[in-house]
Amino acid sequence: MRKSPGLSDCLWAWILLLSTLTGRSYGQPSLQDELKDNTTVFTRILDRLLDGYDNRLRPGLGERVTEVKTDIFVTSFGPVSDHDMEYTIDVFFRQSWKDERLKFKGPMTVLRLNNLMASKIWTPDTFFHNGKKSVAHNMTMPNKLLRITEDGTLLYTMRLTVRAECPMHLEDFPMDAHACPLKFGSYAYTRAEVVYEWTREPARSVVVAEDGSRLNQYDLLGQTVDSGIVQSSTGEYVVMTTHFHLKRKIGYFVIQTYLPCIMTVILSQVSFWLNRESVPARTVFGVTTVLTMTTLSISARNSLPKVAYATAMDWFIAVCYAFVFSALIEFATVNYFTKRGYAWDGKSVVPEKPKKVKDPLIKKNNTYAPTATSYTPNLAGGDPGLATIAKSATIEPKEVKPETKPPEPKKTFNSVSKIDRLSRIAFPLLFGIFNLIYWATYLNREPQLKAPTPHQ
């Protein structure tokens, strides 16, 4: 049987087409194969980087000083505790350095890794000099980022919450300002081994988020950066410092302390306008205002640490207390002179009562009447021609009017003391002058921002 030439040609054409398609599929790798190749290359690069790597040794050991560049992004600042003299800050802390042992060549220029790789390489032993407590966030995984470029430069970022010490000078409280420092550096490496530098210019090395302030009693004015050397018994260390400048808001204290003190002083001066005879009312005014000032003084100190010096608020309360107490002493003085009679225009004279003249009286029908004496003369010889005088007569009483002096002119009682008149002017005037000097002095004073040098 003989095959037809047409069928044979068609068969050969199909075979040729299939072989061509098959060849193309083998020549172009699929997407899965391409991803598999990248993963393999990535794994080989990491294995090669860690092959013979000793993370106990710093980069450039014995050859050069390791330079660590840092910058900080503040996500949240506050709160600030005056009583404990500390503040809380939440930051993204970035460090960058170069490690020639981690150079690589491959299809990618940057290796983006997580915290697992960070534990296998050398990282700076940075700590916060004035930190009381620092927390590295671990939810849901450790908040750490590591990037390695092909030239061996590393970027290491972590999220931290730091509670740091903020030394405060409260002489100007509550018109005070503070510079809260954040100081960090290497714990074990001296400046001959590891030095720190700011990544960018000072204005951009520390950035605070626009909505990062968590302050109720302060305004965050800005931040400044600096660096220095600290000498300790184990050597000289580089210390990086950031100062956060804070200005206290006075509104809360005006409402809570200053206005009540001013109103209490004014209330104590109301007693000068009361009559000096109003002893109970003026006593209540004096005692009540003194007790009120005592209560305000105690409550104002509760929110502050127990410092050995007087603050601006202490001086204000002390002067207000002196005004209130002086008003009470003024009333005591007025009352003293009133009782002695020196506050009258003239002394009061009480007219003497006329003395009654006693006459011999006899009682007749429950009435008393003066009587005359009966005389019976005896004449010698008993001459009957002579009349015997024996007469008894009742004499009508005459009213005896006592001698009266013309009444003295009535003295007018002066109920307003000269001391009260003087106090009505002197006390408000002196208190106004004090307020003018006080507020002009403290509101225009330049705050002294001091920060102690850290010690290791």
UniProtKB/Swiss-Prot annotation:
It is found in: Postsynaptic cell membrane; Cell membrane; Cytoplasmic vesicle membrane. Glycans are attached at N38, N138. One of its GO terms (molecular function) is GABA-gated chloride ion channel activity. InterPro entries: GABAA/Glycine_rcpt, GABAAa_rcpt, GABBAa1_rcpt, Gabra-1-6_TM, GABRA1_ECD, Neur_chan_lig-bd, Neur_chan_lig-bd_sf, Neur_channel. Its main location: membrane. CDD domains: LGIC_ECD_GABAAR_A1, LGIC_TM_GABAAR_alpha. The chain crosses the membrane at residues 254-274, 280-301, 312-333, 422-441. GO terms for cellular component: chloride channel complex; cytoplasmic vesicle membrane; GABA-A receptor complex; postsynaptic specialization membrane. Keywords: Cell membrane, Chloride, Chloride channel, Cytoplasmic vesicle, Disulfide bond, Glycoprotein, Ion channel, Ion transport, Ligand-gated ion channel, Membrane, Postsynaptic cell membrane, Receptor, Signal, Synapse, Transmembrane, Transmembrane helix, Transport. GO terms for biological process: gamma-aminobutyric acid signaling pathway; inhibitory synapse assembly. It is a multi-pass membrane protein. The keyword Chloroplast does not apply. Residues 1-27 form the signal peptide. The keyword Transit peptide does not apply. It catalyses: chloride(in) = chloride(out). Allosterically activated by benzodiazepines, the neuroanesthetic alphaxalone and pentobarbital. Inhibited by the antagonist bicuculline. Potentiated by histamine. It comes from the Eukaryota. 4-aminobutanoate binds at R94, T157. Disulfide bonds join C166-C180. Residues 28-253, 302-311, 442-456 are extracellular. Residues 275-279, 334-421 are cytoplasmic. The extracellular domain contributes to synaptic contact formation. Alpha subunit of the heteropentameric ligand-gated chloride channel gated by gamma-aminobutyric acid (GABA), a major inhibitory neurotransmitter in the brain. GABA-gated chloride channels, also named GABA(A) receptors (GABAAR), consist of five subunits arranged around a central pore and contain GABA active binding site(s) located at the alpha and beta subunit interface(s). When activated by GABA, GABAARs selectively allow the flow of chloride anions across the cell membrane down their electrochemical gradient. Alpha-1/GABRA1-containing GABAARs are largely synaptic. Belongs to the ligand-gated ion channel (TC 1.A.9) family. Gamma-aminobutyric acid receptor (TC 1.A.9.5) subfamily. GABRA1 sub-subfamily. This is Gamma-aminobutyric acid receptor subunit alpha-1. It comes from Pongo abelii (Sumatran orangutan). The gene is GABRA1.
